[in-house]
Amino acid sequence: MKLESTRQGKRLVPGDEFFATSQYFSSFYYNDSHYEPLLGFLKDVRDQGQYGKFEIAIENDLPHAGKDVKFERHALLMEEPEESQWFFQNDMVDYASDPEKSHVVFQVQTGKGKTKCALKTVVRRQKRMMLITKSSFLDKWAGDITTNLKLKPGEFYRVKSGSQLEGLIDMAKDGKLDGRVGAKMIAISSHLIEGYINGYLESGGPVAPWELLKVLGIGGIVYDESHMLFRMNYWSAMFLNPAYILDLTATIIPSNEFEEARFLERFPMEARYDKLAYEPISDVYAIYYGMRDHKKVSRINRMRMYNHTEFEKILFKGTKETQDYYELIDSIMQPWYFKDRKDGMKCLVFFGLVESCKDFAKWLDRKYPKLKVRTYNAGDNYDATIKADVIVSTTGKAGTAIDIPGLLLTVLTVPVDKKSTNLQILGRGRKDQIWGKTPVMAYLVCRNIGKHVHYHRQRMSLFKGCVKKHIVLNSSRMV
């Protein structure tokens, strides 16, 4: 919703990162839930006369219904049989497809098929839709969309730049999105939409953000992992004014009271689908180890705020320490990955630095030349990555939203503070339907580093009820 004062040039209410003010338009933009408090505030200011006399103009922009489309060639099983392990998805899709609902949040744990349910909902709603997510997740989504919806060229657009978005707008104005082969899905990153909105607020443009979906014929938005880049997704939902929103997120866990309030605004309780009980899938092991170099330990413990990338830079300066650290990871892989390994079984290893990922991948490749080892970071191909035996990545790249079939071991070398990130990484392991094995997540804890121990204790509490077992192992290994 947009609220404008007719008195030009006055910012009657200060903005912060969850609000937007524009001197160019003398406007104030906000979430619907703030309407009554803000209107009351403006009336008080007006009545007090401190800004002189002014009128308050209220505009209620109704969302655009969107272009009707059909997905005739899709490859989705729209109704799961009662004996299927995915039978519960029918209720999810029915809930999200209800024409009376304008906002649905799939608050469902990883591995329950949110992507498939979202695509089934898209098919059921029969509207041209937009997908918004992190740019690093778009490769995976492009594959899911083309594979499951069987879209031809001209039916699916992946927007990679501002100039491409401008080109798409021009095509829409010329009617080229509505031809014989009309657009059905448009995928774009949260950052790109953010840039478009900011550009308009700063200097204007041919199409206002709240008119964009009307111009493109978009009838709804699917937000994947909408808790990530949260402020961006909060803004775009506010500015784009979609007729329908489907949020996909397993972890709506606020870090503080302010974030909790914003989460309730962006993910209202009445919109959340949270009927499914959490099913523990994995075993978790905390692996304690020690550091020999007391000077390095002291330097790390003196950090005002713990930074794991700095930890890796300090630790990996020594050749012996690097070798010992890699052998520690290898010792974790021996019982839970290499023992009884079959084709198709996979392992995922997390580091803090991209360079650490590359270096460990080379080390592992030299030690096990028959093993397919790949890194997955910026520039690495998603389809090629998931075919590897061992994948080495950062938590920012592979910690969320990617599915790795056959993943049985996740090794986390990074002490993570954020609750949602820990749960997302835990969720990388999925129920094994092939070999009957329990997925394992193993994380490292340096007993000499205070923050490592602190984050471990937080995980012990956080993972209660979310894992089959959580065991602490004291290793004698030193690095």
Protein language model regions, located:
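Conserved two-lobed SF2 helicase motor
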Residues: 178-201, 386-400
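Conserved Walker A/P-loop ATP-binding site and its immediately adjacent core
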Residues: 110, 115-116, 122-149, 352-357
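Conserved helix-turn-beta segment of the N-terminal RecA-like "Helicase ATP-binding" lobe
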Residues: 137-171, 367-371
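Conserved interdomain linker/interface between the two RecA-like ATPase lobes of SF2 helicase motors
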Residues: 273-347
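Conserved RecA-like P-loop NTPase helicase motor core
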Residues: 378-462
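Conserved helicase ATPase core of P-loop NTP-dependent helicases/translocases
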Residues: 166-173, 358-396
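Post-DEXD/H (motif II) to motif III coupling segment of the RecA-like Helicase ATP-binding lobe
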Residues: 217-220, 225-286
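Conserved pre-motif I regulatory segment
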Residues: 64-105
